[in-house]
Amino acid sequence: MEIIYADEFVKQFKRLPKSIKQRALKQELIFKENPIHPSLNTEKLIPRSKELWSIRVDRKYRIIFRHLENRTVYFLAIGEHDWIYKYTNRL
């Protein structure tokens, strides 16, 4: 699986605490191997028409992504649970 990172995702990632960055990288490796691994809690977001999905970094942080084609995904944003879902409403 290939992951493409939005510029906004990269900016958000750089601002995260070191422990969250490490956890996010670990979850990304799991995601590449098995996008529906139980630890990721992969879910399609509402409204479903936006085709946005989330995976869990930990209890507080999420990564929002969109499926592209040919086993490629686009990581759009990373942040705290409440903020990230408000963010997706603007997409």
Question: What residue ranges belong to the model's regions?
Answer:
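Arg/Lys-rich, positively charged N-terminal/basic patches that mediate binding to nucleic acids
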Residues: 1-27
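Non-catalytic, surface-exposed connector residues within folded enzymatic/regulatory domains
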Residues: 3, 25, 36-39, 78
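Nucleotide phosphate-binding site architecture
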Residues: 10, 46, 85
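A short, surface-exposed loop/turn module that caps and links secondary-structure elements
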Residues: 30-55
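Enriched for short, Lys/Arg-rich terminal
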Residues: 60-62, 66-91
